[in-house]
């Protein structure tokens, strides 16, 4: 994968230079160069921070969860360790199918901020169900994982198309770099937090030479991230109404 990515980078660089040369030959103005004041504009934009916070909170409740999901299936739902990765594996498979569908839905009907709110509510529901000591059966875990797949597809399909409506096009590349920087802090810190919580507060007895864990507290933490994501999504909808970003408007105008 790294080799393919490296090849893609060189191809992109080649065609980007070719495009610049073509624009020069046609006498068209090149893109505006990067300026430090662009960063200042972006980080003083409240809409940017709301999207960035929603991004880091939402993904922090999904990707780190996937890291521990297989063990959760074994510890709580008594799934065979050889099959434990199958249920969490439904998440990315579902996202491949659902994300384009939800993206098309957003293009046609709009309601981007509303879709992000709905996805955040679904995220809270999923992690609350995983935290509660009810129905510790594999098929229940499968249903909950499918619902998480819907949320995992719904929020990004509305969040990423909404981003260019908040940030001017000439600053969009810088804004994407900043939002991924913020996101990666969360993706770095949350697994460390969950691992520390498990080792400090959630250890159970050793069974057949293997350490057991109670995942109630980690799932409650993930649910808390969902609650915070919901609050931010509601704030984003209010900011959209105030600033007129057009997040609730369809991208395809009839």
Listing of model-derived features with the role each one plays in the protein:
Residues 45-96, 156, 160, 190-191:
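Extracytoplasmic gate region of multi-pass secondary transporters
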Residues 79-88, 137, 141, 214-215:
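Juxtamembrane helix-start elements in MFS-like secondary transporters
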